[in-house]
Design a protein with these regions (language model features):
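Beta1/beta-strand and adjacent pyrophosphate-binding region of the FAD-binding site
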Residues: 1-14
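Glycine-rich FAD pyrophosphate-binding loop
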Residues: 23-43
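Conserved N-terminal glycine-rich FAD pyrophosphate-binding loop of Rossmann-like flavoproteins
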Residues: 36-56
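A conserved beta-strand/loop capping segment in the N-terminal third of enzymes
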Residues: 50-105
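Flavin (FAD/FMN) cofactor-binding core of flavoprotein oxidoreductases
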Residues: 70-76, 251-268, 325-332
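Predominantly flavin-linked oxidoreductase catalytic cores and closely associated redox partners
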Residues: 107-249
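FAD/FMN-dependent oxidoreductases across multiple families
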Residues: 224-308
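C-terminal helical "tail/cap" subdomain of flavin- and related membrane-associated enzymes
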Residues: 307-384
Length: 384
């Protein structure tokens, strides 16, 4: 019998959610995380109402809500076009990934999961009883045996490159992401609101996080970045020149950190299983950040993986059917959202089309996007 029932590769929101729930059911769980916490991540730091529902399943909603900024309204500013105000049907939460990831990983350990930070997974090999997982901690390489693997290694891990999972995405549009922190806004202009800004070849957003600081994150097409001078300052200058509301907003803010970049990013769904491993979070596909649903889908997919695995452990589902059942359930819950995300991406990254749509549809377009992209109930469905 392997020493672990499940090895979870990655301690982000999806991995910690899966690990904590499985450990809560008495399963022997090991988390292998290459970074040491707390850590900065390129992310929108936005927890939609669906994400709050997932936190409720974990028993963390009240705890996170008490610390986070509550977002109830916002505005979408189209480059060279109108600025469209909107209200969210349910309050969202804004909390830095440093705080969120550390809190979730600590919670998973409190449920009984073991965790090793600074442990870089080098490879997975099938074995008669499950998997051999190779990982290194500094110069030392080790191997551990497990019955199942949950892959929560993010959008483009070395494991993805080894397993050639990005061949299909590499033929698509490449994006790069960034984030930066600003000191608290003294006039409270961003209290309870989010600003979304479109510019040629990309988009970005501003929102308050815990403590009153303002978080800035965005995406730009690699083809657009290559036409600009090197560095994130050139991307920001391009965005500000194209979008006056963004320029006005940033002129009132003072940076408190340097830019942090990430990429390449391929915005597409990937297979939800790979050789028996269950893919969760960005490892199963990167949802467009402008949807505000990335963290919600990450948490919900972690919950789904744990729920499906527990059915296998308990005998309610045949053990060999676990990957197939997870893949079918993942597609049922998330595939349509990826489709709508791609459709709206073609709109928001094309300035002429975006301007025309904003002038013609305005608030109706924003409300439709919120309805199509922000469908709630994922966590409740997964947990049923």
């Amino acid at each position: 019998m392997p020493p672990f029932d499940v090895v979870v590769v990655g301690a982000g929101p999806a991995g910690s959610a899966a690990a904590g729930l499985l450990a809560r059911h008495g399963r022997r769980v090991l988390i292998l995380e290459k970074d040491r916490f707390p850590r900065r991540k390129v992310c929108g730091d936005f927890l939609s109402a669906s994400a709050a529902d997932a936190l409720e399943v974990l028993g963390l909603r009240d705890e996170v809500s008490a610390e986070a900024e509550h977002i109830r309204r916002g505005a979408l500013a189209v480059a060279g076009g109108p600025e469209i105000p909107f209200r969210l049907p349910e309050a969202a939460l804004s909390l830095s990934r440093e705080r969120l990831d550390a809190r979730l990983a600590s919670w998973a350990q409190s449920q009984g999961a073991q965790a090793r930070f600074g442990a870089l997974v080098r490879g997975l090999e099938r074995s008669p009883e499950g998997f051999h997982v190779r990982f290194s901690e500094g110069p030392n390489e080790s191997r551990v045996e497990t019955r199942r693997v949950v892959a929560a290694w993010g959008r483009w891990d070395a494991m993805d490159r080894e397993r050639a999972q990005h061949d299909r995405q590499a033929r698509g549009r490449r994006f790069l992401g960034w984030s930066r922190e600003f000191a608290p806004d003294e006039d409270g202009a961003f209290a309870g609101r989010v600003g979304l800004y479109l510019f040629p070849g990309g988009y970005c957003g501003l929102s308050r996080v815990e403590g009153g600081g303002v978080h800035f994150a965005g995406m730009v097409e690699d083809s657009t970045r290559k036409r600009l001078a090197p560095g994130w300052d050139a991307v920001l200058a391009h965005a500000r020149e194209s979008n006056r509301p963004l320029d006005r907003a940033l002129s009132r803010l003072t940076p408190s950190t340097d830019f942090k970049g990430a990429g390449p990013v391929y915005l597409a769904a990937k297979p939800p299983t790979e050789d028996g491993a269950l893919m969760v979070g960005d490892a199963a596909g990167v949802l467009d950040p402008f949807t505000g649903q990335g963290l919600a889908c990450a948490l919900a997919s972690g919950i789904l993986a744990a729920t499906t695995l527990e059915r296998g452990f308990s005998g309610a589902l045949a053990w060999d059917d676990v990957p197939r059942a997870y893949a079918a359930a993942w597609k049922d819950r998330f595939r349509q959202r990826f489709g709508w995300s791609a459709a709206f991406r073609h709109l928001v990254t094309r300035p002429r089309i975006a301007r025309a749509a904003a002038r013609w549809a305005g608030g109706r377009l924003v409300r439709s996007a919120i309805r199509r992209l922000g469908t709630g109930g994922d966590a409740a469905r997964v947990n049923s």
